[in-house]
């Protein structure tokens, strides 16, 4: 089977990560969450991770250039080229979308689908209010589920 290439977009708390895992189980495509990749790069103390962390610690968004570079590194990996991908949380901006388009053209990869997930704003607030993160592994979960 040919690798599939998907992008999931939607607000935080809509379930992009959950759907990415389900799509991996069904289609074999590698979920790539920008948040997870940030945490991994920070934990590994890479140059990009340290740079990203300097913004995160100040409560600022990580600049497009750093985000794009981190995601490009993963998208170019042998595993992702072999399995395909489900992007979660990337692209978030027009600049990131343009960079993704350029990168995929360079890799001779075409997106199969962009899926927009929608949710009632009140549900988003409820989900995010109960969202917690494990300090050891970085997993994000809802207080009601653990």
Mark where each language-model region is.
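Glycine-rich phosphate-binding loop of ATP-dependent small-molecule kinases
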Residues: 1-146
């Amino acid at each position: 089977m040919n690798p599939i290439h998907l992008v999931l977009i939607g607000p935080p708390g809509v379930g992009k990560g959950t759907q990415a895992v389900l799509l991996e189980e069904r289609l074999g495509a590698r979920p790539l969450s920008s948040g997870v990749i940030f945490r991994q790069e920070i934990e590994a103390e890479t140059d990009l991770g340290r740079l990203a962390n300097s913004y995160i610690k100040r409560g600022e968004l990580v600049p497009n250039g750093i985000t794009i570079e981190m995601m490009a590194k993963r998208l170019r990996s042998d595993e992702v080229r072999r399995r395909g991908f489900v992007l979660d949380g990337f692209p978030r901006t027009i600049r990131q979308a343009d960079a993704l388009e350029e990168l995929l053209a360079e890799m001779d990869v075409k997106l199969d689908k962009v899926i927009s997930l929608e949710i009632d704003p009140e549900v988003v607030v409820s989900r995010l209010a109960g969202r917690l993160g494990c300090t050891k592994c970085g997993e994000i979960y809802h207080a009601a589920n653990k």
